[in-house]
């Protein structure tokens, strides 16, 4: 399926709201390929040549399912009075309170229409060795539709306040605020599609304003998921693709994800002076494009449009971004957003963003093997250029300190094409892939490593 029609640093700290549709629906299934921008579907080529392999420790296989004692089936028409068998499925609300650690709730396909938030309550936990599992049954596609909710900061879709849950294969749309909000720790989400929600598609943040900093959500993983066309109708300033901001602990990871057509930013890692520094977030093997407007062109003067926004309010946090790509975003591709710390930027590619591909005006950031081409403004790169391995867009040229020059000839294709494989892995085909004979191949560090993500 096609993913791409085509394409201000703000205090996105909408104080302690879960942070907040009217877009053309672009269906990007977590289980089917999706296509982008005018390119046809492409084969299962690897997205990011330099990528560390995307984590894939699925707790539950999606084929050859054998129902174990204690597992439960849920369907759109399930009843709390039913036992939760395949022939007599229970309701989701009932299953969430009944499932034991190590057991699985299988979601049958179809549309689950909700007018109220679904909450996995605090204390409803799995364990490190026995997660609680909430997964699509086989190849079926469960869709959680919260369109009946009104726009309000309390009207999230799925709230996860428990620990050690594994959630896979859901589509979540139309929520009055966040599509999915993670307030617990040690949770893992895979192959989620969040779209047309009225705030950020998938956000991590504290479960309540009374939570101590030691209770801030930590060590959550969002894997091979896609968040798009999220739009907050009050001012268009809050709805990002993914966010780990304001009140998150250490160890949260986004791996192999795509954020596109969100009215504000692709990723938002905002820190706020009221609550202090958040924990270090790692983003790898991920893509942000065409953020700052929805697919039908809906935007506001407040819509920032950064691909990866990595800070806020001059607070230092040493985030990590690796093997990721930003292109065609309204504003910057990657921005420090006033974070003066030592963000580690390694093997990223940024192309054709509205302003700077890399905007790191101040700080002691660490840059290794990054590639910038054809930005709207010159890059700003305060920090260390490790072994002079970065190629920056400066004065309308891509250059580096060792004399490398990048041109269109260094790429196999500059025609955007983005799809997802059956397991949600992003695929770019030849887009931004280094061409044979390019001087950028093998010019990074360690010796033999390519410059850029591909």
Role assignments for model-derived ranges:
Residues 87, 106-109, 125-176, 231:
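Right-handed parallel beta-helix/beta-spiral solenoid domain characteristic of secreted/periplasmic
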Residues 191, 285, 299, 312-409:
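Extracellular beta-rich repeat passengers
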Residues 72, 105, 132, 142, ...:
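Solenoid scaffold repeats with emphasis on beta-solenoid/beta-helix
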